Structures are given as C-alpha cells and as structure tokens.
Regions:
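Conserved ABC ATPase "signature" region
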Residues: 25-33, 90-91, 132, 139-156
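Helix-to-loop junction immediately C-terminal to a conserved catalytic motif
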Residues: 75
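Short coil-to-helix segment of the ABC ATPase nucleotide-binding domain corresponding to the Q-loop/switch region
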Residues: 121-128
Length: 304
C-alpha cells in the first residue's frame, strides 16, 4: 500500500480549562468518564486515521460525535489539543499560519455545512473566486467556473446573486466553488444535504465521475448510510469524539464492532437492485463506482 497522503495520529480536542494540562496529568489518555468528571467536552478523543491517495473515507456518527471537529483539526481550521497531523509528509501542526493558508489555498478544497458565499458577487464570480486568488487568468477561471456551474445544475443562473438563490442552490454554488480548484485533498461536510433526492443522486453520480477523472483524496462527512455505501472506500464511525470502527462498508455491515455501529448498518436496503443485508446480498461500492465511472468525462485543465 502507498504512503498515506493524510495521517492523523492520536488527535485530541478537549474543550475546557487548560486541556493540555489535564491530558498531561492523566498520562495523555484519560478515559471518557474521567474527561466528563473533569468538566471537559471530548470533541475529538485519541483519534488516529490514515487516508491514502485517491481514497474516499467517509466519517459518520450521530450529531455531536465529533465528525466536523475532526475534519477541522485535520485541516487545522481549529487547533488540536494534542496529536499529530501529517499531509504529504509535512507536520501540519508545525506549519506557520501563512504556510497553512497556502496549503489550504492550493491543495485543500472544503465544503462545510455552513459556508459564506460572497453576497456582492454573482454565481459565476463566486465559483471563479478561488481561482482568482490562485492567479489564474480570467478567461481560464471563468471557463472552469462555467463548467462547474453546469456540473451542479445551475446553468442560466450564472448572473444571479446569492440572495436570489434557494438554500439548495446556494449549497450547489459552494460545491462548484470547491470543485473549481481541483484540490489534492478534499473535505466535504454533508455537501449534498440540502438537495432534493433526485438532484442528490445526480450529484453523487457527478461526484464519482469527477473522482474517476481527478483521483482526489477525499474525507467526506454524511449522515446518510446509503450515500456512504455508494461513495466510500472506507467508512469511519465516530462516537463521543472517538472512531469506534473503520473499514470497508461490507466489513462494517457484516462485522459491526459495537451495537452503536450496528445501528448504522442494520435493516438497510441499498443499491438500485434493492439487495438486503439480511439476505447476505451486499453490493460492493466499487462495482457501483465502476458503473458510473464508465461515463467519465474530461475536465478543462487549468494552468497559471
């Protein structure tokens, strides 16, 4: 197996008074009861995960389980209490603020649940904005932006302003904006959650086609287990800030490590064929992806 593009080792994020001192006093690994009795909130708890080039890792868990906080620790949008995060072999926790800005600008794409579109810019200008920041000339960035606008189904709304769009349309602009930069590492926090079911399915198809062309490394948060089955190479399930199990979708379905994991994987029908887990018929996500990727299309290349 190739070396991990992103590696997180024993990451912690505790909220409370002097969390670093608290961890030190408890040997760097206090149990959950000790954390709570000490008055701390365990947002991320001794979490380790490696993400390999071209892999889609999906993070699942109930609200408050630590999914979004973990992603923000991985991108250093928030500072971890303890642990190590490596990207392309570089220790991100030792990077300067300016170095992190450049890494996020050129190598990371992000779509979070709540993001701010620029209200004074049109849809086309919003999607092209990160390319403008990169210094790409106007004709190329607008061509790329137009392609992404078409991809997310917003043709005809290039000249609209965010206030003129529905919530779902605004989310699609955010997705297009993130896709425009062709990131090496892509963080997505429920990017399709505001879309209606038909558009959501279409966006999943387009997402897989893009992945077949670009081969990006992706960390994806969703509450939808069917979506996770369809998209993931591996799924990590979180509870109380910790990853309780990580593995291939079929492994989690057939051998859940805990009752909590079983809640996400039991009594599910997925795949267009309607295979049922309780019959032992589990469609492999790779087969679904391969079927979609046969129709992969070329994207406009960008250069400075």
């Amino acid at each position: 197996m190739s070396e991990a593009l992103l590696s997180c080792q024993h990451a912690w994020k505790l909220y409370g008074d002097d969390p670093e001192g608290f961890l030190a006093r408890h040997g760097g690994n206090p149990d959950l009861n000790t954390i709570r009795e000490g008055g701390y909130i365990p947002a991320v708890r001794d979490t380790s995960v490696d993400v390999y080039p071209g892999e889609i890792v999906i993070i699942m868990g109930l609200s408050g389980s630590g999914k979004s906080t973990l992603v923000r620790c991985l991108s250093r949008l928030i500072e971890s209490t303890a642990g190590q995060v490596y990207f392309e072999g570089k220790d991100l926790l030792k990077a300067t603020p300016q170095e992190m800005i450049e890494i996020r600008r050129h190598k990371m794409g992000m779509v979070f649940q709540h993001f701010a579109l620029l209200p004074h810019r049109t849809v086309l200008q919003n999607v092209a904005f990160p390319l403008e920041v990169q210094g790409i000339d106007r004709a190329k960035r607008e061509a790329r932006a137009q392609e992404m606008i078409s991809l997310v189904g917003l043709n005809g709304r290039e000249g609209y302003y965010p206030r003129e769009l529905s919530g779902g349309q605004q989310q699609r602009v955010g997705i297009a904006r993130s896709l425009a930069v062709e990131p090496e590492l892509w963080f997505l926090d429920e990017p399709f959650s505001a879309l209606d079911p038909l558009i959501r399915r279409e966006m999943q198809d387009e997402f897989l086609r893009l992945q077949s062309v670009l081969h990006k490394t992706i960390v994806f948060i969703t509450h939808d287990f069917d979506e996770a089955i369809r998209l993931a190479d591996r799924i990590a399930i979180m509870k109380d800030g910790a990853i309780v199990q990580i593995g291939r979708p079929e492994d989690l379905v057939m051998a859940p490590a805990t009752e909590y994991v079983a809640e996400f994987t039991s009594e599910r029908a997925f795949g267009d064929e309607g295979y049922l887990i309780d019959k032992g018929l589990i469609p492999m996500p790779s087969a679904d992806r391969a079927m979609v990727r046969d129709g992969a299309k070329s994207l406009t290349p960008l250069s400075m």
